[in-house]
Amino acid sequence: MHDFLKAFKDAFPHTISIFLGYLLMGMTFGMLLAQQGYDYKVALFMSLFIYAGAIQFVAITLLSAQASLMNVVIVSLLVNARQTCYALSMLDRFKNTKWRLPYLAHALTDETFALLNLYAPKKGVNETDFMFSISLLNHSYWIFGSLVGSLVGSHFSFDTQGMEFVMTAIFIVLFMEQYKRNTNHKNAWLGIAIAVVCLALFGTEYFLLIALVLMVLALILFRKQLEC
């Protein structure tokens, strides 16, 4: 228990920026869900067991449109397909996490993945406990935001337009932090180039998954050149 608390204290400061973003986005989700007539229990269930910001927002539209189960499954797979790339890249780090593995896989959101690759535990801190703490903290922030938003949204009406930019801003900050920490910027510029080309060719609706697949392939094929 002492080792876990040590890792928890080490992980917490790294998650503060995510707390601010997840609080706002979680509240937005909860408010939108409440406006569709669903109470806090639905928000809690979705944030506990689905825990995927994009698909949770899409689910609100699907629920209001009374979409079929098959449509829900297909849309969920398409929206969250990028998580496969994240999971594959974390296989080595997760392989010795034992009973924590199912939760670490479940909680591997975009932001958690970014933090796990940006920060390392301090000397003497168990890496598995550190990764678990970051995942647990981020998940808790999302649940808290969703519950607050749901409870507030059931009593008041808010204009949530533009709130989605919060997470984009967080990603930019995390990218800049990683860019400053590393002297080799080849990976960063390669990722930017692939993303820009895919955006130009495939548009905003399809570029993300294609860009991620191409980035993974490029990192595998040109690993030695990029590490020089």
From Swiss-Prot:
<comment type="similarity">
    <text>Belongs to the AzlC family.</text>
</comment>
<dbReference type="GO" id="GO:1903785">
    <property type="term" value="P:L-valine transmembrane transport"/>
</dbReference>
<keyword id="KW-0812">Transmembrane</keyword>
<feature type="transmembrane region" description="Helical">
    <location>
        <begin position="130"/>
        <end position="150"/>
    </location>
</feature>
<feature type="transmembrane region" description="Helical">
    <location>
        <begin position="42"/>
        <end position="62"/>
    </location>
</feature>
<feature type="transmembrane region" description="Helical">
    <location>
        <begin position="156"/>
        <end position="176"/>
    </location>
</feature>
<keyword id="KW-0472">Membrane</keyword>
<dbReference type="GO" id="GO:0005886">
    <property type="term" value="C:plasma membrane"/>
</dbReference>
<dbReference type="Pfam" id="PF03591">
    <property type="entry name" value="AzlC"/>
</dbReference>
<keyword id="KW-1133">Transmembrane helix</keyword>
<keyword id="KW-0813">Transport</keyword>
<feature type="transmembrane region" description="Helical">
    <location>
        <begin position="192"/>
        <end position="212"/>
    </location>
</feature>
<keyword id="KW-1003">Cell membrane</keyword>
<protein>
    <recommendedName>
        <fullName>Uncharacterized membrane protein jhp_1251</fullName>
    </recommendedName>
</protein>
<dbReference type="InterPro" id="IPR011606">
    <property type="entry name" value="Brnchd-chn_aa_trnsp_permease"/>
</dbReference>
<feature type="transmembrane region" description="Helical">
    <location>
        <begin position="14"/>
        <end position="34"/>
    </location>
</feature>
<dbReference type="InterPro" id="IPR004471">
    <property type="entry name" value="Brnchd-chn_aa_trnsp_AzlC"/>
</dbReference>
